[in-house]
Amino acid sequence: MTKLGIHGGSGKMGTMIYECAQNFTNIEISAIYSIEPLKYSPNCIVTNDLQKLFENCDAVIDFTIKDGAIALLNYAKSHPKPICMGTTALGSEGEALLKECGKKMPVIYATNMSLGVAVLNSLTAQASKILRDFDCEIVEMHHRHKKDAPSGTAMTLAKTVANARGLDLEKVRISGRDGMIGERKKDEIAVMSLRGGDIVGRHSVGFYNDGEFIELNHTATSRATFANGAIKAALWVINQENGLYDINDCLGIKKCVR
């Protein structure tokens, strides 16, 4: 029986991971880290002490915010433990910590734990190369409570397009248009964010040319999709060598390259 710990147990994803874990026969949630009171009554250790969390699990699943994730990674540097990191918008500090931790333990980091999004990302890479002269626009939609924009998944997709086309994303990405801005630049990659209602997540990558266009879409209808993906990723990363992996590695789409 594999023991998993949840870092961020009071959030929407932490709660869903605990619920979904009850459907797995080969794991147990053995510890939950949370600063806020839980709205459910788990049958495991609940703590706000990282040491206690780490001591009572085989791997940690993190869904928090930037500061919480960075605190976890800083602790993990001197207390290696397999980590499944789902927190997005980590910034340069968080990304550097991920790489540093990857030298001491197996870490899987994914801005989206969905199998469908992994396939969307793979198709986006292929389309970006084949349709090199097509304009690319990315649109993401989420619920009104989402705090960061663009979503981590949208940024991953944008990076995929830029890498496939040999572009520097920071130089070609835009996040909105307003006023007399002139014609669209040739290599521009637009990433647009919409917020409203209770939309779990929708991502669209469009390739547009004169006379034709193609759009690749993924819609998540339940957070259980991400929760189940995170649990499976945590089970996978436990058996890997030290390194920084992503969801494509877990699914066998490519080997670890970082």
UniProtKB/Swiss-Prot annotation:
UniProt-annotated catalytic positions: 142 (proton donor/acceptor), 146 (proton donor)
Subcellular location(s) per record: Cytoplasm
GO biological process entries: diaminopimelate biosynthetic process; lysine biosynthetic process via diaminopimelate
Main localization, broad class: cytoplasm
Binding site for (S)-2,3,4,5-tetrahydrodipicolinate: 143, 152-153
Top-level taxon of origin: Bacteria
Entry GO MF terms: 4-hydroxy-tetrahydrodipicolinate reductase; NAD binding; NADP binding; oxidoreductase activity, acting on CH or CH2 groups, NAD or NADP as acceptor
Enzyme Commission numbers on file: 1.17.1.8
Reactions performed catalytically: (S)-2,3,4,5-tetrahydrodipicolinate + NAD(+) + H2O = (2S,4S)-4-hydroxy-2,3,4,5-tetrahydrodipicolinate + NADH + H(+); (S)-2,3,4,5-tetrahydrodipicolinate + NADP(+) + H2O = (2S,4S)-4-hydroxy-2,3,4,5-tetrahydrodipicolinate + NADPH + H(+)
GO cellular component: cytosol
UniProt pathway: Amino-acid biosynthesis; L-lysine biosynthesis via DAP pathway; (S)-tetrahydrodipicolinate from L-aspartate: step 4/4
Listed SUPFAM superfamilies: Glyceraldehyde-3-phosphate dehydrogenase-like, C-terminal domain (SSF55347), NAD(P)-binding Rossmann-fold domains (SSF51735)
Keywords attached to this entry: Amino-acid biosynthesis, Cytoplasm, Diaminopimelate biosynthesis, Lysine biosynthesis, NAD, NADP, Oxidoreductase
Residue numbers binding NAD(+): 8-13, 86-88, 110-113
Primary role: Catalyzes the conversion of 4-hydroxy-tetrahydrodipicolinate (HTPA) to tetrahydrodipicolinate.
Similarity section: Belongs to the DapB family.
Protein name per Swiss-Prot or TrEMBL: 4-hydroxy-tetrahydrodipicolinate reductase
Organism listed in the record: Campylobacter hominis (strain ATCC BAA-381 / DSM 21671 / CCUG 45161 / LMG 19568 / NCTC 13146 / CH001A)
Gene this chain is encoded by: dapB
